[in-house]
């Protein structure tokens, strides 16, 4: 499965990591991924953004901020995680989300922009395995 990154030297990945097809990490700043993290297909993790003003953008001005993904996080397919974001432990990010702000631990969050929907609870436990 293809994996793409800018450098790779600024990426730290914990134990038991799963990254699906077409994972792209633009690591102009540090990217820290915790233990037991699942990342779905076609996910982009971008620490860098171009300037908003045309003169700065044309001059190549960019800004980079770190991204931290906690332990036991699941990021669904086709998500984008933007610069400066922290995703807390045990959180689930729904497919197709654009994460532009910090997401706390232990919640289900999705949307564009991504927002907290509810906490992850024992009611979410799967009791019948198919």
Labelled PLM ranges:
Residues 3-86, 112-114, 118-130:
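Flexible, glycine/small-residue-enriched loop-and-beta-strand segment within the central core
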Residues 74, 92, 98, 108-110:
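Short-chain dehydrogenase/reductase
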Residues 88-91, 104-106:
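Conserved catalytic segment of ABC-fold P-loop ATPases
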Residues 96-97, 102-104, 114, 120-121:
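Short glycine-rich donor-binding/catalytic loop of glycosyltransferases
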């Amino acid at each position: 499965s293809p994996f793409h990154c800018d450098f790779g030297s600024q990426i730290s990945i914990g134990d038991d990591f799963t990254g699906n097809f077409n994972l792209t990490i633009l690591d102009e700043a540090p990217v820290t991924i915790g233990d037991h993290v699942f990342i779905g297909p076609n996910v982009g993790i971008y620490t860098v953004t171009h300037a908003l003003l045309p003169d700065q953008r044309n001059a190549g001005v960019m800004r980079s901020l770190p991204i931290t993904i906690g332990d036991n996080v699941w990021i669904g397919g086709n998500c984008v995680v933007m610069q400066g974001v922290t995703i807390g432990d045990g959180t689930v990010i729904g497919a197709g989300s654009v994460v532009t702000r910090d997401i706390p631990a232990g919640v289900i969050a999705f949307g564009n922009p991504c927002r907290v929907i509810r906490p992850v609870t024992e009611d979410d436990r799967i009791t019948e395995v198919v």
